[in-house]
Amino acid sequence: MGKGSSGGGAWWAFLLLAGVLLAVAATAAGAEEDVATEVAAAADRDPKEDLRWCRKGCQWQYGQDTRQRKECERDCRQRHREQEQDADEEDGSGRGSCRSQCMRRHEDEPWRVQECVSQCRRRRGGGDDDVAVDACEGADRCRERCERRHRGDWQGKQRCLMECRRREQEEDVDDRCPCPCRRQCERHGDPATRQRCVEACQRRREEERRHGGGDADEEGSRGGRCERKCRRHSDWQTRQRCLQQCEQRERQEEGGRDDAGDGKDTYCADRCQSMCRQRHRGDREMQRRCARKCEREEGCPRRRDATADADEAEEDDGNDRCSQQCQHHRDPDRKQQCMRECRRHQGRSDDDDTRAGEDDS
């Protein structure tokens, strides 16, 4: 009799424990659903909630990385200003539906609503109404995976979603980005930062096309010629400098400002170089930068004589040597620091050789 009572008591204790566990699980799931509902309702009432959640997403994603977190928050503020400017145009234009679509699609990811609205409005502004609000094909996979791993932990699920989105962006960013913007944003090692750079570049190019008309096409053809010419440089910084110099020469040629034969222009450039040699003795790289800055400030036209071409070729060769020497650095900041030290050391070596030659003569 006592033995049966003991077995029955254990059975009732087991049932009671199972009921408690079910109640806890239901409470956690309900709490997560309540948080998501509260987030969606708050953001629907006040568009400024998008900005707040976007900033919170930057904090979750980058944590102690102050530089990238500030860059992410700056993009949040930029998108918020654009949405405020577009607020007056929403009535009757159909663009107001972007927000409701994004709210439904990202009700459990409030930090993505602001970016989604910006992308939707850009597509609507370009006349492409049939494009989906979110082009990421792996969005549903990420959501299902993170819900299984972090059931009941809303904040943990947000971090999981961020990591999953970042991996998805890293896999398909090269397929979705226009070539000029992708080339311009290669310097960013972090996929999320590179994607934001590409989106900002796309916005600028769309604004140029809207306001500039044919000038944007002309700029694109000029950039294509310079891109082919500067493709030989493997280092990103050297290639960008080559592109800037090439495009500047193209603009000067198109504007009819080729004044290389004018003695006054030569005197202007020579004066800058002489001043910078005195100011930065022994540092050839600083002499070049100082001379370029001085020529821009003084308005000196770029020389097209053999000396200028030789200097540019010499600088390119030096940059190629330095880029090969520093290519083992994966971190962009360390690679740039290595490049600067290499150029500075190379400039001193060239000056020492020059002084030695003068002493021998």
From Swiss-Prot:
Protein name per UniProt: Antimicrobial peptides
Alphabetical GO biological process terms: defense response to fungus; killing of cells of another organism
Lineage: superkingdom: Eukaryota
A GO-annotated cellular component: extracellular region
Skewed-composition ranges (Basic and acidic residues): 296-307, 328-341
Biased composition (Acidic residues): 308-318
Keywords assigned by UniProt, alphabetized: Antimicrobial, Disulfide bond, Fungicide, Plant defense, Secreted, Signal
Organism of provenance: Echinochloa crus-galli
Signal peptide positions (record): 1-30
Subcellular location(s) of the protein: Secreted
Sequence segments annotated as region (Disordered): 296-361
Record has Secreted as a keyword: yes
Keyword Signal among record annotations: yes
Predominant localisation class: secreted
A Pfam family annotated for this UniProt entry: Antimicrobial21
Intrachain disulfide bonds: C98-C120, C102-C116, C142-C164, C146-C160, C322-C342, C326-C338
